[in-house]
Amino acid sequence: MSLKSKTVTIEGGRDNGKKFIIHEMPAAKVDEWAMRALMALAGAGVDVPEANEGMMGLAKVAFSALGNVPYEKARPLLNELIDCVEYVPSGGTPRPIDLNIGDIEDFTNIWKLRKEVFNLHIDFLQQGNSPN
């Protein structure tokens, strides 16, 4: 079975109509990312979900709770989420996002794409349950 991907089209604002492809990380990489995120959350004093809530509990708090993690620890985690996104220029070939040349003009869309990446990795947990 191949890794999942998803196309996201931005609606409205300065990035209206821009398309991005979200790619799933390989299992070992996402496991390592999740462990570092969990440790960063716990280290920042975030109340990590009870063991009986499992990954669904973590999914409920992880993305919003990253705001409690010191910048030095959160930034690499957030950057790794953006590394899963490719920009599809109009009529062009998908390529890694370059935030320095304006692939994304509205910073809120950077956060939207990060959340889309996170959700792609936990969608199997959402079968009948929602982390939001």
Language model region names:
Residues 1-51, 121-132:
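Short, charged/polar N-terminal "headpieces" of proteins
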Residues 32-76:
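Structured domain cores in non-transmembrane regions
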Residues 22, 63, 96-98:
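Generic secondary-structure boundary/loop-capping signal
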